[in-house]
Structure formats: structure tokens, C-alpha cells
């Protein structure tokens, strides 16, 4: 078995054909001007954890490592929902889900809204009006009936599954078809195999799979992942020398479950070297019961060795995406466009990847699902490359960043995010946010959840179960829920026929004075944010007004 050193050597060799070459040294970053407006290249692989690209992390990402040394890494970037559609819509609009209207999967009958609200504007529209050439390649997943072209992009390559507009089948015909498929295909499939999750009547799933060598492309990557990137490289070649600034976005399935990866990338890792996440043994006893059900109904079927193998495949899939990213960077360099191109590497959301014993994404509030990788390189616009910035960044910040870089006045658009350009210039922006917020209304099954997180604490309002409160300094892996109620105490009071009232403040569950103050402060922030961003999560009726403090606490 190879050693860790040979793994790194193998990864470096794998990336050699798409090496990120050093760029010439730059002086003081230039301000965006119409005469030298930057190009914009965005690579968004799906479902990638933030931690996998951190320097020193055992997941192999040699291209991102070199790229980060030439740019700025934002370690505290968060999406507004750990779900493809709302986060991708926020990226394209600079708005939160409550403002653009996309809360869950737009391609299901349970979509809260199948498309962004009418009149929603997308940042490519502004770039096009400013003279930019625009192109989109790969996964979209922003609306059921809108395509990248509708949002201002010119489509280069879109997977077959998304090459449709106004072709969605809903209502009775769709339901009849779904039932017929379920009856025919989702049968009990016998004993569980290694790496499988047994789901009676639903059909088993293979969490991970090692695929044969892929000979259809020089990287040995999955063809469905390679094609959007290949289309992007061809577009980069055509854009060179066009005389116009351009923006190109390339997106694919990234590290999305399930973790099926060609053997070439799997063999870069030693299964014996894979460690379980530090919070893997979390029994979730003080967490919402849906979290417990997700773990114990499905994921607890996997042995520790299977979990390690699944993590290995998740990392291997991320390494494959890193090789594809290197192909884009290499093409950008070879065509002479790297010097004045803003390149962004990010994801739409994360993946639990074994954290707390969970996989994929969804309603669990843990940071592994919300914290996304974010690295930006712009040789002409970055001071002191190689930095890490730990300020809170939101997915909504990218759209205004691109527009400011293009020289478009902020008075021309209305967005909720803030430009990241000051951070790139090495400045400390005035009044930068000291908290981040989420807006989750569920996935295919509905759950109302809101998160407010500061550097010190994280509060999770769960309209469907107990709330959560974590001390981010003392408990960085979110193991102990400080808001978990002492149910036995309340039960005893009920059995004794006594009321729970304890004076002026009867917020439940009772907490220590310090934590009670923390909770009140964070809920004040939550309601203030909800009001500012038109988030209609309050209803005063007694059966649904479950937050310990209602919106009146902010007044």
C-alpha cells in the first residue's frame, strides 16, 4: 500500500497536465474601470464541504491548493440553505430565498415555488447590458421553467436532464407515472450488500461505488462531469482575443451523492488512513428527532469500515473535481487570459459526509452542510495573495462582487449581499456582518428552520422540534445542544398539577441567565433579519408560534 507521501506525489502527477502555473507578480491592485474590466470564471461543483480544500486536510486538492496560494480563501462562507435550488438561486440573484422565492427542489410536486418570483433579476442580466459576453455550462437547477438563457446567460452545454423548458409534467399524470414506477422498481431488494443502505419498498441505494477506468477523456474522469468542463474550455479558447469582457460559469454534480468514482481517483487514498469525523459518535440524543431518525433508520446500517470507505469515495470524487478545475485553469493560462480574470471556486452547499453519522444534506443544521468552500483569484485585484479571511461570507455576496468588479454602480441594482472586493484589496469593510442566517423551509418534506450564527454562538429555531444552541468556541463540532429542554422537570410539574410560570420571563426551556441572554439576543437578530428580508416565518396562532421569543421581542 502506498504511503501518504506517495499519495501526494500521485495527486501531483495527476494534476501535472493541468498544473496551475505561477502568475507574474502584481503590484497594487487596480480599481475596476471600463477600460480594463475583468473577465469572470466561476467553477461550482455541487455538494462540496468547505473543509476539504483547507490546507493540510487529507482530501487531495492540489489544483485548489496552488490556486489558493495565488488568491484569497474565505473560510467562513455559508449558503442560505443546504439544498441545491435555493442556494443556486441566491448565487444568481444576490438575494435570500425569502426574496427570490426558491426554497426547495423546483423539480418536484412538493416545490414551494417552482421558479423565482416574477420580476427577479439575475446578475448576468446586468453584465450583458454592460457589454459582457456570457456563457453557462453544466448544471443549472434554479427554476423549473427558466433556463440559463432566461437569466441572461448564453447556454453552452446543459445536461440532458435540464434541456427542457415548459416540459415539466405535474398533477395527476405525473403522480400516476410515479406510482407506476414505484410499484415496478421500488421493491424490496433482499439482504444489504457492502456499502448499501437497505430501504424496504423504496429500493436500496449504494452510497459509494468504485467504477472502472474511464477511457473516454484524458483525465479519466466521469464523462458526465467532464463534458461541462470540456465545453467550458472550448468556450475559453473562443473568448480569447474577442476584445470584450466575458463571464463563464461551469457547474457539475461535483461531490454529490452517491459517491461513484473511477478507480484512478479511489486508488490515491489508503483506506487505513481514513479517520472518522470527530463528531461521528454523536448519538444525537439532544438533537431534533428527525436527525436521529435519519441516522438510525438508514446510516447506522453502515459499519465503521464502510463509513471510512464512503468518506474515501467522497474525497476521491472531490479530487476528481479538482482535476477538472485544473483543466479550466490551465486553459485560461494557455489562452493568456489569467491575468485579468476573476476566478471563483465555490460550491452550492456542503455534505455531512459522516459528520454526526449523517450523509448528503438536508434539514440537519450542522455546519458541514452549510459551510461552503470559497477561493477567489484575481491577479490585478488582490493584495497579498495566499491569505485566509475568516469574515462571514454569504452566497448572496458573489453577485454584487461581480457587478462592482464590472464597474456597474450599486445604484443600478438591489441585492441583499455585499461586495467582497474590499476583502480582496486587503481592506476591512465598514459595518460588515457579524452573523450569518439561514432560511430553510424543508426539502421534499417540509420543515421550518432558521439559523442565526455569530462567531461565538449558533441558534437554530426548529418549528418542528426542539431548538438548538451551540457554543462555537467550546463546542466547535456541535456535539452539545445547550437549548435541549429538561423535559423531566416540566413533566413533574404537570404531574403535580403545578404551572410552569416563573415571573416575568417564562420563555421555555429555561436556561442559565447567561445562555438565556444569548438566546434572546440571537432571536432578536433572527426576527430583525426576517423583517428586513421579507421572511414570513411568523404566525401568532398558538399552535405554530413555537419560537421562545416572537417578533415582538425585537421591538
Indicate residue ranges for each PLM-predicted region:
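Histidine-centered active-site microenvironments of extracellular/periplasmic hydrolases
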Residues: 258-264, 330-394
Amino acid at each position: 500500500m502506498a504511503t501518504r507521501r506517495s499519495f501526494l506525489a500521485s495527486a501531483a502527477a495527476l494534476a501535472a497536465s493541468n498544473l496551475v502555473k505561477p502568475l507574474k507578480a502584481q503590484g497594487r491592485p487596480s480599481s475596476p474601470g471600463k477600460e480594463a474590466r475583468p473577465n469572470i470564471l466561476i467553477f461550482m461543483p455541487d455538494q462540496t464541504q468547505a473543509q476539504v480544500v483547507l490546507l493540510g486536510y487529507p482530501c487531495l486538492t492540489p489544483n485548489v491548493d496552488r490556486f489558493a496560494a495565488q488568491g484569497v480563501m474565505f473560510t467562513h462562507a455559508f449558503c442560505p440553505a443546504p439544498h441545491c435550488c435555493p442556494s443556486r438561486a441566491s448565487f444568481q440573484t444576490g438575494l435570500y430565498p425569502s426574496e427570490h422565492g426558491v426554497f426547495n427542489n423546483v423539480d418536484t410536486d412538493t416545490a414551494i415555488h417552482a421558479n423565482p418570483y416574477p420580476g427577479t433579476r439575475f446578475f448576468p442580466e446586468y453584465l450583458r447590458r454592460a457589454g459582457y459576453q456570457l456563457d453557462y455550462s453544466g448544471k443549472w437547477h434554479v427554476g423549473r421553467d427558466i433556463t440559463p438563457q432566461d437569466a441572461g446567460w448564453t447556454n453552452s452545454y446543459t445536461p440532458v436532464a435540464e434541456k427542457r423548458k415548459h416540459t415539466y409534467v405535474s398533477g395527476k399524470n405525473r403522480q400516476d407515472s410515479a406510482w407506476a414506477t414505484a410499484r415496478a422498481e421500488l421493491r424490496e431488494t433482499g439482504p444489504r450488500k457492502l456499502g448499501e443502505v437497505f430501504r424496504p419498498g423504496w429500493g436500496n441505494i449504494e452510497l459509494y461505488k468504485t467504477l472502472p477506468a474511464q477511457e473516454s477523456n484524458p483525465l479519466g474522469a466521469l464523462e458526465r462531469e467532464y463534458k461541462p468542463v470540456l465545453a467550458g474550455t472550448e468556450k475559453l479558447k473562443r473568448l480569447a482575443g474577442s476584445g470584450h469582457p466575458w463571464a463563464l460559469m461551469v457547474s457539475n454534480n461535483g461531490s454529490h451523492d452517491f459517491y461513484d468514482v473511477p478507480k484512478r481517483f479511489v486508488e490515491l487514498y489508503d483506506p487505513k488512513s481514513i479517520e472518522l469525523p470527530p463528531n461521528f459518535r454523536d448519538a444525537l440524543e439532544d438533537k431534533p428527532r428527525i436527525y436521529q431518525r435519519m441516522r438510525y433508520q438508514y446510516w447506522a446500517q453502515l459499519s465503521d469500515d464502510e463509513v471510512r470507505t464512503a468518506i474515501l469515495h467522497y474525497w476521491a470524487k472531490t479530487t476528481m473535481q479538482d482535476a477538472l478545475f485544473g483543466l479550466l485553469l490551465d486553459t485560461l493560462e494557455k489562452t493568456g487570459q489569467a491575468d485579468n480574470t476573476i476566478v471563483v471556486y465555490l460550491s452550492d452547499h456542503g455534505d455531512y459526509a459522516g459528520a454526526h453519522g449523517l450523509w448528503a444534506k438536508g434539514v440537519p443544521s450542522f455546519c458541514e452542510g452549510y459551510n461552503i468552500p470559497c477561493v477567489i483569484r484575481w491577479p490585478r485585484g488582490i493584495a497579498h495573495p495566499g491569505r485566509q479571511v475568516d469574515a462571514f461570507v454569504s452566497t448572496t455576496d458573489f453577485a454584487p462582487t461581480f457587478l462592482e468588479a464590472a464597474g456597474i454602480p450599486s445604484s443600478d441594482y438591489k441585492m441583499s449581499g455585499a461586495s467582497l472586493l474590499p476583502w480582496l484589496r486587503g481592506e476591512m469593510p465598514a459595518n460588515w456582518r457579524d452573523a450569518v442566517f439561514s432560511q430553510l423551509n424543508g426539502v421534499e418534506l417540509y420543515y421550518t428552520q432558521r439559523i442565526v450564527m455569530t462567531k461565538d454562538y449558533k441558534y437554530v429555531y426548529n418549528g418542528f422540534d426542539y431548538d438548538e444552541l451551540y457554543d462555537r468556541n467550546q463546542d466547535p463540532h456541535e456535539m452539545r445542544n445547550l437549548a435541549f429542554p429538561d423535559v423531566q422537570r416540566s413533566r413533574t410539574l404537570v404531574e403535580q398539577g403545578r404551572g410552569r410560570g416563573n415571573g416575568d420571563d417564562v420563555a421555555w426551556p429555561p436556561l442559565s441567565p447567561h445562555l438565556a441572554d444569548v438566546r434572546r439576543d440571537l432571536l432578536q437578530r433572527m426576527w430583525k433579519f426576517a423583517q428586513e428580508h421579507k421572511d414570513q416565518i411568523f404566525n401568532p396562532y398558538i399552535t405554530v408560534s413555537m419560537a421562545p421569543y416572537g417578533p415582538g421581542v425585537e421591538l
